[in-house]
């Protein structure tokens, strides 16, 4: 999860987030090289006498500054498109969970079970226990099995919301009258926090998301107790 004064992204907990981190580093390196080149050229212009101020034609230079940006854009676009298509893949999910956004809480329904559904509200600050996180804890966590492909169906009952968990690389809009879907798979157990990421009203900041990823045996025990 995030920590104070953090400069980078959250630690990756899913294959998709790993890919996004690699793409971030790849793009950041390209930006760094371009910025270094521009700063070098500016420093030369400020410290040396300008030459070729009356040049009317420079075919070689024009060719370079046309082709080079095109190559750079291709180097950014190709890995970006690859990840985009990976995020849209649905590969035989082991479990489906339907998520509905409300003003201002989330409701969850495990569609593979006959009667497993609940609402998830933020715990008020005055009711937090020692060690719990302000504005991030909920009364009912979403318990899911780790190392399994899970499909999330996401929609809204009222206004636009967005269901986001940064460490899993997830952000899907919850739109009234429309059912969006995404997949997730956590590679290790733990608690993963997120929040509504679309301004949805006065209590937009009070719609946290908590995923509790557990081994399959623990999930089966939990689901048996909940049904």
From Swiss-Prot:
The enzyme's E.C. designation: 7.1.1.9
Annotated Mg(2+) binding sites: 198
Compartments, as annotated in UniProt: Mitochondrion inner membrane
Binding site for Cu cation A1: 161, 196, 200, 207
Catalytic activity: 4 Fe(II)-[cytochrome c] + O2 + 8 H(+)(in) = 4 Fe(III)-[cytochrome c] + 2 H2O + 4 H(+)(out)
Transmembrane segments annotated in the record for this chain: 15-45, 60-87
Swiss-Prot/TrEMBL keywords: Copper, Electron transport, Magnesium, Membrane, Metal-binding, Mitochondrion, Mitochondrion inner membrane, Phosphoprotein, Respiratory chain, Translocase, Transmembrane, Transmembrane helix, Transport
GO biological process: ATP synthesis coupled electron transport
Coiled-coil stretches noted in the UniProt entry, renumbered to this chain: none
Enzyme class: translocase
Entry function: Component of the cytochrome c oxidase, the last enzyme in the mitochondrial electron transport chain which drives oxidative phosphorylation. The respiratory chain contains 3 multisubunit complexes succinate dehydrogenase (complex II, CII), ubiquinol-cytochrome c oxidoreductase (cytochrome b-c1 complex, complex III, CIII) and cytochrome c oxidase (complex IV, CIV), that cooperate to transfer electrons derived from NADH and succinate to molecular oxygen, creating an electrochemical gradient over the inner membrane that drives transmembrane transport and the ATP synthase.
Family classification: Belongs to the cytochrome c oxidase subunit 2 family.
Assembly: Component of the cytochrome c oxidase (complex IV, CIV), a multisubunit enzyme composed of 14 subunits. The complex is composed of a catalytic core of 3 subunits MT-CO1, MT-CO2 and MT-CO3, encoded in the mitochondrial DNA, and 11 supernumerary subunits COX4I, COX5A, COX5B, COX6A, COX6B, COX6C, COX7A, COX7B, COX7C, COX8 and NDUFA4, which are encoded in the nuclear genome.
Annotated protein name in UniProt: Cytochrome c oxidase subunit 2
Organism per entry: Canis simensis
Organism classification: Eukaryota, Metazoa, Chordata, Craniata, Vertebrata
